[in-house]
Amino acid sequence: MFETAEGVNYISGGSGMASLMDWSTATFGRLIAALETLQKNYDFVLFDMGAGIVDWSLDLLTSLDEIIVISTAEPTSIMDAYSMMKFIHLKDNSKKFYLLCNRAFTIEEGQETTKRLKVVMERFLEKEVFVLGSLPEDVVVRQAVRQQSLFTTLYPDAPISKTMKKIVQQFLTHQVGIEEVHSTTQSNKFLSKLKGIFSKGRE
């Protein structure tokens, strides 16, 4: 585990989870024990699934308590986001989704992107989703990547940094708009669902 000065620790997962179903029961048990420890020691445990969702990652996503869906304004990205939410919703219609538009060139573009996804989910799946907002296209992100540091740390006054902090604060205080959108209590559903997926995959 790598620690950062900002209090956000991370584990580089690589592609190890792709062979999850091939693990022995003992190895999987150690994973569950480690995740239980993380749940006790951290306020939030985030899984960055990235682009290019495959079957095993979709199964993992269905076990999570809450899902933040990040899309750009590009039609292919919007379609991928909708397809993923539809797949998960049909497996578990109690899942909560939060929408975030990334790399928006204007405020209007970001709003239109999240609105399209929200409307389509409500119209075709009768599923309510929550809009977190949008992050603007900003050159400081690439500069921060080159320096291997957080853009919120290197460029705290950049538009994207201010927007990111606002969105995170809204989520941490359990408010999106004027509605409370997620529980302050810790859920144990994730681990029980993950165990179920592992057991099913080995049948």
Which residue ranges define each predicted feature?
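Short helix-capping segments at alpha-helix termini
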Residues: 92-93, 121-128
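Conserved phosphate-handling catalytic cores of large alpha/beta enzymes
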Residues: 89, 105, 119
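Conserved C-terminal guanine-recognition region of P-loop GTPase G domains, centered on the G4
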Residues: 78-97
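Inter-motif core of Ras-like GTPase G domains
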Residues: 33-41, 54-76
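P-loop/Walker-type NTP enzyme "switch/lid" segment
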Residues: 1-40, 145-147
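G-domain G4 guanine-recognition motif of GTPases
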Residues: 72-73, 97-111, 134-141, 156
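NTP-binding/hydrolysis catalytic cores, primarily Walker-type P-loop NTPases
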Residues: 150-203
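Beta-strand-loop-alpha "switch" segments that mediate conformational coupling across diverse proteins
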Residues: 125-152, 164-166
